[in-house]
Regions:
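Conserved donor-binding/catalytic core segment of Leloir-type glycosyltransferases
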Residues: 5, 157-175, 179-186, 198-199
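Donor nucleotide-sugar binding/catalytic pocket of nucleotide-sugar-dependent glycosyltransferases
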Residues: 117-154
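Glycosyltransferase donor-sugar binding loop
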Residues: 196-210, 226
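Nucleotide-activated donor-binding/catalytic signature segment of Leloir-type glycosyltransferases, i.e.
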Residues: 210-231
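Acidic donor-binding loop of glycosyltransferase active sites
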Residues: 238-252, 266
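Short hydrophobic beta-strand element within catalytic cores of glycosyltransferases
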Residues: 263, 267-271
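Conserved acidic donor-binding segment of nucleotide-sugar-dependent glycosyltransferases
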Residues: 282-283, 287-294, 304-309
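A short, well-ordered alpha-helix in the C-terminal region of glycosyltransferases
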Residues: 304, 311-325
Length: 336
């Protein structure tokens, strides 16, 4: 019998890299470092072998503790079965939440609320989500377990006459591509191409590919450099000055790209999504711009940093200090 099962979307077959898969892999690594007997089940297997769901159920009933990281569909459809099995076989479930959407998701799911209130623990990325679950649904089993990264990287800042701006996330309109391309248009119209570069990294969302490639082709100072493997991220970001993430997802949790920026010692400019102020100290390790109609301020802040390298350097120092908050925690509490 396995002591611990990590159950979630790891994306191992296709090497899919996004916030969900990276956090699930990191939790598996963390559990493997702390405990001797750790198994895993990658729910991506459902896409390739439908009958593998029975393999998952077998793993569920033969383990002591589940580290559970479901996305929306898994939580809605599979979790009720896992919950029932856990009660029959006395398995502890620890749900590590990815993102900040759970309160809204549960609004019309009273059965799911009941089940979640009776598992061993719900571990949210943000204090605000913890408070919402307690206040809205009277959950008593919630704590905060922030997103994290493994790192021993030491930045060595390189110098450039240009402000090197980077976007690293899913290449998706909802991550703020439209605002970044509006910035690019401003740069082009004001002939600032010799002062700013824009680089994009990340998997391209199929529905937005045509839009992204068309916009990218307009600006010779903008480039797409593909998908970074986890081992490449920090060394690559080290060659940039500033990260943009003007997300339109209001219920973002803690985007992993922000942690990676801090580890690499570069500040961020983000929209004020629901949890932004828990993770970005405005004016210290980056800037928070309005969630609605924040494009003018995005352009203003980028231009200000282009012209004030002393301010940029102070933000870089603040970003590097902030990274210590996201060092790997311990999870020995799951066996209590």
């Amino acid at each position: 019998m396995s002591k611990i099962l990590v159950l979630g979307y790891l994306g191992l077959r296709t090497n899919q890299l996004d916030g969900q898969t990276v956090k699930t892999r990191d939790l598996y690594k963390l559990a493997s470092q702390e405990f001797d007997d750790v198994d895993l089940y990658d729910t991506e297997d459902f896409k390739f072998k439908k009958l593998s769901i029975f393999k998952m159920f077998w793993k569920v009933i033969t383990c002591r503790t589940i580290i559970y990281l479901p996305a929306h569909n898994n939580l809605k459809s599979i979790f009720p079965i896992i919950f029932v099995l856990s009660k029959f076989f006395r398995t502890n479930i620890h749900y590590f939440v990815v993102g900040g959407w759970l309160r809204e998701f549960l609004a019309n799911l009273p059965l799911h609320r009941f089940m979640l209130s009776h598992i061993s623990g719900i571990h949210t990325e943000t204090q605000r989500l913890k408070s919402e679950l307690e206040m809205c649904y009277n959950f008593k089993n919630v704590d905060v377990f922030p997103n994290f990264r493994f790192f021993d990287f030491q930045p060595s800042r390189t110098q450039s006459d240009k402000l090197r701006v980077v976007f690293m996330a899913r290449v998706n309109k909802m991550k703020g591509l439209d605002w970044i391309f509006n910035l690019a248009e401003y740069i082009a119209l004001n002939r600032l191409e010799d002062k700013i570069t824009l680089s994009f990294y990340g998997p391209i969302h199929d529905e937005d590919r045509e839009y992204f490639e068309a916009e990218l082709s307009k600006y010779p100072f903008a480039e797409y450099n593909g998908v970074l493997q986890p081992s490449e991220i920090h060394q690559t970001l080290n060659d940039y000055d500033l990260m943009l993430l003007p997300t339109h997802y209001y219920t973002e949790g803690l985007p992993g790209s922000i942690i990676d920026a801090y580890i690499s010692g570069i500040p961020v400019i983000v929209t004020e999504w629901k949890h932004a102020r828990e993770f970005v100290d405005n004016g210290i390790c980056g800037y928070i711009i309005p969630f609605e109609n924040g494009e003018p301020e995005l352009i203003e802040q980028v231009l200000m940093l282009m012209n004030n390298r002393d301010v940029l350097q102070e933000l870089q120092i603040g970003a590097l200090a902030k990274r210590q908050v996201f060092a790997p925690p311990t999870i020995d509490f799951i066996l209590n």
